[in-house]
Every structure is written in structure tokens, then in C-alpha cells.
Amino acid sequence: GVPAVICITKIDLAQNENDQLDASIQQCAAEYRQAGYPVHLVSANNGHGLDEMRAALRGRLSVLLGKSGVGKTSLLNALQPGLGLRVSLVSQVTGKGRHTTTQSELFELEFGGSILDTPGVREFGMWEINPDELPGYFPEMRPYLGHCRFGLNCKHDQEPGCAVRKAVMGGEISPRRWQSYLRLRSEA
């Protein structure tokens, strides 16, 4: 698969007057790190985390993917000053982005590597994923798969003897990530 890196943008909006980050953002980042994903907290406005993000992108072909208005193009402008790519404010009426980026464009990065800026995604969903394969897409669940009472037939929901549920209850898997898995499974 393609290695994913999570970049939480606009963190300046979640900082208090002492530059301390909101606890819910810290918790979310910690949960994804525990699951094995690199997580970067960045701000295009104040420059926080940009050097670490450049290091993560250096020498790679990367794609910026996310909903409209999350700051993908603003991040790219901050990572490589001088690009001057057009950005818009989030709509005050709808609270959503305005799809300023209308087509994907590949940029060579002066610090090494290249990055594809993409239009905002309107909706994320499941496509042709077998519900029984879904647990394998959650790295933190993989060590427990096959160790349930019902083996690989376990849905990891309410079944007795579920190793995944035991790991959730024991704090080894984030309850929020487990709930996300259950929500996706119900959509599959």
C-alpha cells in the first residue's frame, strides 16, 4: 500500500493565548501515532511544524488529500514560498471550503521531491471493500486478527472472546478508532 502521513493543518486556530494546543487535537494526534501513522501538526499562518513537514516530504512523490477548505494549498504556499497559488477563505455561511483548486497539479519542491495539490474531496466513503477485509486496514488491529474466539470470522463488535475488543478495553487500541472501524463496517 501507499504509506500515509497525517497532517493536521490550521493548528493555530486550536491554540490558546499561551500557544498550548487544544487537548482534543493532542488526543487525536496521539491516537493516530499509536496506530502507527506519522502525524504532523502544522500552521501555514505561523509556520509551526513546516520544517518537520518539509523533512517528511523531501525526496518523495506526495499527494495532498483532504476536504475543501482544510488548507492544502495554503500549506503548499507555506512550504514553498513564492508559489503564489490562489486560496480562498472558508465560507462564513456554510462553514465549508470553496473549491478554489479545481484541478490536480504537480509541483517540484525546491527542497527535494514533488507534491500533487488536489481539489478538495466533497465526500469520503467506502468503495468495493469487503467488510471482512476492513480490520486489515486498521494497523493497530492487525496483531489481534485471528486471535478471537471466532477466529477470522469475528466482526470485532459484540462477539464474546474478541481480541480486538479486549485490546480496546485495555487501552491498546483507541476507542475512537474502534468506533470508526464499526461505523465504516456498517457502511460497507
Regions found by a protein language model. Name each.
Residues 61-65, 76, 92-97:
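Short, surface-exposed loop/turn motifs that are enriched in glycine and acidic residues
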Residues 68, 73-74, 78:
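Walker A/P-loop
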Residues 5, 13-70:
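Canonical P-loop GTPase G-domain recognition
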Residues 1-5, 11-20, 31, 38, ...:
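Helix-rich effector regions associated with P-loop NTPase G domains
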Residues 59, 81-82:
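Short, well-ordered coil loops that connect the C-terminus of an alpha-helix to the N-terminus
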Residues 64, 77-81, 87:
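Conserved ATP-binding TGD loop and adjacent catalytic N/P-domain core of P-type ATPases
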